[in-house]
From Swiss-Prot:
Family: Belongs to the protease inhibitor I47 (latexin) family.
SUPFAM superfamilies linked: Cystatin/monellin
Organism expressing this protein natively: Homo sapiens (Human)
CC per GO annotation: extracellular exosome; extracellular space; membrane
UniProt GO molecular function: metalloendopeptidase inhibitor activity
Biological process, per Gene Ontology: negative regulation of cell population proliferation
Membrane topology annotation: Single-pass type III membrane protein
Pfam families: LXN
Protein name: Retinoic acid receptor responder protein 1
Subunit structure: Interacts with AGBL2, KIF11 and MAPRE1.
Induction: By tazarotene and by all the retinoic acid receptors tested.
Described purpose of this protein according to its UniProt entry: Inhibitor of the cytoplasmic carboxypeptidase AGBL2, may regulate the alpha-tubulin tyrosination cycle.
Tissues expressing this chain: Detected in urine (at protein level).
Length: 294
């Protein structure tokens, strides 16, 4: 039996009143007149440049999509980044093709409890080109980031986390991370970070120009014993989609070993309006871990 789509609990519901559920209303919200600095037009792009200013929500949407892609491609729980601030950007709109966004933004380490060496800053900087194909998911992304954790240090941190997982006497079977009070036990932080790593692929694949997801909760985790050295586990996540305030259950299977390609398979209930029939989305991926921007 497939998990049923769930409404967001009251604490997450925001201000009272009707919420936009249709993609058109979500697009209008995204394009509200909150502007960031705009650049000049792209001479090679047939679309129309946004001369008067680019909606900040669109730049943030592009930056978050780029980070989902970047985190998944990194294959490293120690390298996870989140958006700190959008610094500048520009966009071109082609009604037939979609929207192309160039955005520059700063990032910070996803796990604020990670130990920092003296002189090591939390912030990094990224530049991304993101192409939203109208309302289709899985935007095309080219992203480069700098001022990140050194490769050697990242590998050391990943291996320490890996050893902690392998030293467990019994495979994990966990329910609800974080708990109902929003707390993540320090002993479960690695599981959460690995789940975030795999979920980044799912969130990138499901993202559109108006839909944005973040990881709300793990509702189940099951680690499997393997005959090789990999970490292999299944987990169910609840993804929060902001424009519709929907919660989407996804079952994800992840195989991880430090320095090796990350393997992800998933099966999600499709985001839909109440008038639409039920559906599912699924996919899988294996990615390289050697990236030019590390």
């Amino acid at each position: 039996m497939q998990p049923r789509r769930q409404r967001l609990p009251a604490p997450w519901s925001g201000p009272r009143g009707p919420r936009p559920t249709a993609p058109l209303l979500a697009l209008l919200l995204l394009l509200a007149p909150v502007a960031a600095p705009a650049g000049s037009g792209d001479p090679d792009d047939p679309g129309q440049p946004q001369d008067a200013g680019v909606p900040r929500r669109l730049l943030q949407q592009a930056a978050r999509a780029a980070l989902h892609f970047f985190n998944f491609r990194s294959g490293s729980p120690s390298a996870l980044r989140v958006l700190a601030e959008v610094q500048e950007g520009r966009a071109w709109i082609n009604p037939k093709e979609g929207c192309k966004v160039h955005v520059v933004f700063s990032t910070e380490r996803y796990n604020p409890e990670s130990l920092l060496q003296e002189g090591e800053g939390r912030l990094g900087k990224c530049s991304a080109r993101v192409f939203f194909k109208n309302q289709k998911p899985r935007p095309t992304i080219n992203v480069t980031c700098t001022r990140l954790i050194e490769k050697k240090k990242r590998q050391q941190e990943d291996y320490l986390l890996y050893k902690q997982m392998k030293q467990l006497k019994n495979p994990l079977e966990i329910v609800s991370i974080p708990d109902n009070h929003g707390h993540i036990d320090p002993s479960l932080r690695l599981i959460w970070d690995l789940a975030f790593l795999g979920s980044s692929y799912v969130m990138w694949e499901m993202t559109t120009q108006v839909s944005h997801y973040y990881l709300a909760q793990l509702t189940s985790v099951r680690q499997w014993k393997t005959n090789d050295d990999t970490i292999d586990f299944d987990y169910t996540v609840l993804l929060h989609e902001l424009s519709t305030q929907e919660i989407i259950p996804c079952r994800i299977h992840l195989v991880w070993y430090p320095g090796k390609p990350l393997k992800v398979k998933y099966h999600c209930q499709e985001l839909q309006t109440p008038e639409e029939a039920s559906g599912t989305e699924e996919g899988s991926a294996v990615v390289p871990t050697e990236l030019s921007n590390f």
